[in-house]
């Protein structure tokens, strides 16, 4: 892949979306993970200014992620704001009858979405997405949470390709070396949740996408079963609500 051309195409896409919407710029959630770090870097290259980052940790968020996010803001000279969302989450815990880790993780993602759109309106800017193709195909995200955005420049790149582009753009090694995590609860790991590494997941997704039967026969049947199950079960997350036509 020609990463220079891909970078230029992504930057053009960001510029076009902001211009066509008559917005001032973009707002993004900066978690300290590689996906949002890459999007922030692309936004800075594309827009130079009017890139606003929200850092929204909870009490159990990995402190190293916040430090990495702050370092990136300094390196890119980004305007940012830290909003601790634990008090909002605590209010939910007091009222809700469903306080499983998954439920709390989903609610935290929706708190962040609400804040992003609030600042989007305040700054006349677009919320830019940070989900990669692997996550989108699997529905590995919170509907109306981290999946919510006005547009997404990296949604056509598999997670393994995100790492390649991040290296090409010289992102700090901390982003590249850390284990993938949505940081929804303490010690949460994407690959542990999914049961396979992203390298294997992407290999399976590509084989399914191209219907490469020869490759599919060589892959772990449990991997393919997991991928098909998640893709089928979570298809609704990538669609607008269906409206009955009268």
From Swiss-Prot:
GO MF annotation terms: ATP binding; glutaminase activity; metal ion binding; NAD+ synthase (glutamine-hydrolyzing) activity; NAD+ synthase activity
Family, similarity comment: Belongs to the NAD synthetase family.
Gene that encodes it: nadE
Enzyme class: ligase
NCBIfam families the record matches: nadE, PRK13980.1
List of residues binding ATP: 29-36, 130, 159, 181
Amino-acid positions noted as binding Mg(2+) in the UniProt annotation, renumbered to this chain: 35, 135
InterPro entries the UniProt entry points to: NAD/GMP_synthase (IPR022310), NAD_synthase (IPR003694), NH(3)-dep_NAD(+)_synth (IPR022926), Rossmann-like_a/b/a_fold (IPR014729)
Quaternary structure annotation from Swiss-Prot or TrEMBL: Homodimer.
A Pfam family the protein falls into: NAD_synthase
Documented EC number(s): 6.3.1.5
The entry's keywords: ATP-binding, Ligase, Magnesium, Metal-binding, NAD, Nucleotide-binding
Entry binding sites for deamido-NAD(+): 110
Signal peptide: none
A biological-process GO annotation: NAD biosynthetic process
GO CC term, one of those recorded: cytoplasm
Record's protein name: NH(3)-dependent NAD(+) synthetase
Pathway the protein acts in: Cofactor biosynthesis; NAD(+) biosynthesis; NAD(+) from deamido-NAD(+) (ammonia route): step 1/1
Function: Catalyzes the ATP-dependent amidation of deamido-NAD to form NAD. Uses ammonia as a nitrogen source.
Reaction equation(s) it catalyzes: deamido-NAD(+) + NH4(+) + ATP = AMP + diphosphate + NAD(+) + H(+)
